[in-house]
Amino acid sequence: MPIEETAAAPFTDGTWLLSHNGIVDRGAVGEAFGAESVVDSAILAARIFVSGVQNLGETVRQIGAADPGARLNILAANGNELVATTWGDTLSILEAADGVVVASEPYDDDPSWVDIPDRRLVRVRDGKVEIEGL
């Protein structure tokens, strides 16, 4: 497969930016929904945008059920809100006075980093973190 810009994150619907860290069977995602590339992450992003980022948890549960080996760490942000999932891969958060960091893994030795358990949805808005099970 040739290297192409449309296959690289972040993907956007004009409002949200989205990245996917992991792997998923394209057949488990469903139709391409107008994806600009055939790579799994582009098809997954298109499915999420069609389903609505507000429904990210349900979309991840459906795809995870269809592909038990999927790794679906997704990060979506629109400038006001950040939504992330951990499904089969690591995710950590760091809450600080000047903001919240969400990352695949801690980037330093700060003891304030918190590892998020698998199969969780994380929402960050106005400096507040909410975590719910998937």
Please provide the spans of the model-predicted regions.
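Conserved short alpha-helical segments that host acidic/polar catalytic motifs at enzyme active sites
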Residues: 1-134
